[in-house]
Each structure stands twice: as structure tokens, then as C-alpha cells.
Amino acid sequence: ERLDFIKLKQLTFEEPDTETFYGLKLGIKAGETGGSMPTVFNAANERAVARFLEGKIRFLDIPKLINLAMENHTLISSPTLNEILNIEQQTYDFIEETIKSGKLD
């Protein structure tokens, strides 16, 4: 059944629990930092989720990998399209190398 906003009388929102949902905290940080950091966050999340779905990492390794990628990145305040594409590939490579190295265990 579709959600009917007219029948819905009230919506209640609470502050998100960013300690339990650490990936959300990292996403907020990437957005607030700006520049090239959202690209790193997105690319790291994409690759980590893909490897989780393949059974190569644990679910809780996803935010660990994202955090490592963000910490490893040197921020570019106003990246060009070519820089964004390079950062994306570098982040994919960083995630793969980190998984292969066994640094998550």
C-alpha cells in the first residue's frame, strides 16, 4: 500500500544516532568538508558495499573502509572533472588494496 501523506496526520523526526550509524556521520562530515571529500565518501561506500555483497568483507567493515579512505585523502577544495574521476579511481584502488592487505582484521 502506498503512503498517503494526506491521511498521515503527523511525522516525527529525531536526531540521527551517528554513533550507531557511523557511516551517516562520515557522510555528513564529507558533505560539510566539501571539495573532493564527497567523491571519496561515495566511491569508498560504493566499493565497500560491493565487496560486502560479494562476501569479501563484514558489514561493519564498510564504515571502517570509508573512514580510512577519507583519512588517506588529500582534500582538493575545487576539483575539476578530471580530478574527480581520478579521485574516484584512486579511492576504488585504495579500498581494494586495504581489503587485500588484511588491515581490517
For the regions a language model picked out, list residue spans one by one.
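Catalytic, metal-anchored helix/loop core of enzyme active sites in primary metabolism
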Residues: 1-105
